[in-house]
Amino acid sequence: MKQEKEQGLCSSEVQSQREKFGTNKLPEPELQTTLDFVKDALFSDKIVILLMVMALIQLFLAITGFGTFSEPVMIAVVLGIITAIGVKTGKGVQEANRKLKEKSSLKYCNVIRDGKVQTINKDDIVVGDLVCIELGQDIYADGYIVDGEVSVSNAAINGETIEIHKKPIKGYIPEKITSDSYNNENCLFAGTTVMEGSGKMIVTTVGIDTVNGKTLVDSQTLEAPETALTIALNKLSDFITRWGSIAAFVAFALMVVIEVIGGGYQNQEWMMIFKDIVEKASVALTIIVAAVPEGLPMIVKLVTQQNVVNMEKTNILAVNPNKIPEMAYLNLVCTDKTGTLTTGIMTPEIISGDAFQENLVLNNEAVFDKDGNITGGNSIDRAMLSILLLKDKMKVYDEAMKKEIVARQPFSSKLKFSGVSVKENDVVFSYYKGAPERILEHCTKYIDPVGGDIMDLDVIRRSEIQQQLSEANHKAIRCVAFARKNGQLEKDILPDDMVFEGFVGVRDPLREGVKEAVQTAKEAGIQVIEMTGDALETAIAIAREAGIYEDGDIALTDQEFSEMKDDKIKDILPRLKVIARCAPSTKLRLVTLAQETGMSVAMTGDGTNDSPALARADVGFAMNSGTDVAKAAGDIILTDDNFTSIIRGIKLGRTFMHNINMFLDFQLPINISLLLLNLVFPFFSTGAFLTSALILIINIIMDSLNSLSFGSEPEKEEYMKEKPFVKGTGLFDKQSKLRIGTATTSFSLAYIILMFPCATMFHGEAEQLTARFVLLCFMAVMNGFCVRVEGANLLKGITKNKLFPAIAFGILAGAVIIAQLLYGLLGLAPLNEMQWLVIIVLSMIIIPIDLARKRIASK
């Protein structure tokens, strides 16, 4: 038992344990098959079901000789295309989600094997492994704690919020653990989280066989709730469907009434009357189909999928893809300093004193492995330990590690110190390490760095130390102080009358590109607040270097912030740029108050205590180097922990929303025009404005293909020159409404010209029907060029989205082929050169009208 606890498994045992007890990898959730996606495409939409019913009726009429096969065949072809696109999109999104889940669930832990600390994938844990457990880490397998003490939360498994204290088991370790052991003081369970302390555990059960294995598998299949965007889009679709249905019913009634008044049903066989009514009902149904922008769900899925891929390429893992559009609304980013604004690579710059070396070793989460490499702990822990290498003091480390530790106080960002109690020759004494102002105010003596004598810490010496610390802080050097006292530490209490041992200052340089990213944020209307655990002077120095803080801005300590009333904080919020010695509770309070003022807030975090603020923020950016708790609370994981990636993510979020809006600005004029024209047309002519087959063709072309086209629009630099999207304004701003109104007016004007002044150029119903069809196709393409840019150059950036010109050309070519070659199947007629020229000229009416709108809007 003792040997196992210290050395862990040997390499030869790992594979045999895996073969005997299985892997720790949980089974993959069952994926949808192609047949499942086909069923979804055909039977999840009531309109598609109605289309299939209509196709069967049309087929019956064709078989009985009262109709042609063109209508049911075209409906079947369109349904086939819709199904194919739905299956392709669904499978693509599913595969993207699977890969995202795989990457976001990729977690590592430290185990001891062959007597050395090794970092392994959590899936590679085997029964018998000696696993190191740390604050903020998830427990990945069932087992017993054998060293250290921890408090764990079972909330993720059973909803119980009370933390359970765990301490080492003595003697024999049972082979099995049951759920009856949740409150057992020695048992640890997969799926729970370490909220306090650290230690080691022996694994007894892995994977699906753990107590919570089935629950953990089930949690992988839970669907995310709808976001504000999807709810808004669904409401829009419902609104259009409702009014489209009303318009379809009115159009159907008008066509039947006009037919009756005109005597069309007199002396007709009942089967011919039934055929005519079915055709009119088919047109009415296709009006509903055309009115509803079915491409909306597809473009949301497509753009989300593309953004997840694009973000991953730039070190952004969108574990909650639904939050991608939320980034377009962000106007406040609250960021950590260490590792986010700075490199996180700590280099010792100042070493004041020599008496803290044993404190530095024992009061530290980092260790030297057998090869002499520093592992574990955070960047400051590792920087502290590297001092021993600089001073050639490895003997100090070896001697210190032999001493008996009887109590630990883990570092807390709230308490701002850590501690350790050591027993030597039956005497217990304690070491403390933390923020200099916290340590220094509790010290009454100090160790003379020259002679090593313990002396009174008088006002003069205290002032000298404070001056040294202040000078270091102004140079953006972060300082950590050390002290000692006889006796065992008390939990969460920093004692008085300590002996000051000295301090260390480490430098953490600004990351490359941060200054430029901060400037981009300013130009994009985004406020940046640095929230750091550093001293105020250090925080201001880094913020000034990054361009966050300027003369006239406000920088506060955590204490100053906590003493302010809510209304005062809201008043100064626009000028607030720095909060130093920041506690996690301050982060949560700032997020809450900023949201109350209407701001959309992003918060970064890496610690367990950051999780409430990350969860409360509109978008939570968790650091990849952070705890499992922080990453679980975050929406986005920054795999490089870099501030520049946040700004990049915001740019992609804005691109997402612009692409959605472009599709709506493109699609809705077509939907509205079809509704209006189908309603008005029966007053001026017999029959329908377009046949059901033609409306379905337009619908599949405009909805499905252009959702791919606009979904592929790349990010644009001008998006970061705009102000953020505003909460509560809905999907359409003033300019968007003007674009839709202008385009709808242009469509209507073109058809008025076609149907009246130019009517004599098109002979017979077949040619007129062809003209109406191809004009709509051509105008849609021209409108697409208009909505994708805000300037006069309609070809700007056209090569960056190769799908757009390809689909535009495909639509134009398809319209020509249908009109000139496939006309017989659809009741059309080929057009001559002059007729095509009229169509082309009329389709371009939208360009000067939209340019005029853009000119007026720019003023």
Residue ranges and their predicted role:
Residues 105-234, 563-573:
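Cytosolic catalytic regions of P-type ion-transporting ATPases
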Residues 24-106, 219-314, 522, 532-536, ...:
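Hydrophobic alpha-helical segments characteristic of transmembrane helices
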Residues 226, 251, 283, 296, ...:
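Membrane-embedded transport module
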Residues 187-195, 326-500, 506, 519-520, ...:
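Cytosolic catalytic regions of ATP/NTP-dependent phosphoryl-transfer enzymes
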Residues 106-110, 284, 295-364, 613, ...:
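Conserved catalytic phosphorylation-site environment of P-type ATPases
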Residues 40-63, 79-83, 106, 238-265, ...:
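Alpha-helical transmembrane segments of multi-pass membrane proteins
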Residues 8-40, 104-111, 164-165, 171-172, ...:
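Non-transmembrane, extramembrane segments of multi-pass ion/lipid transporters
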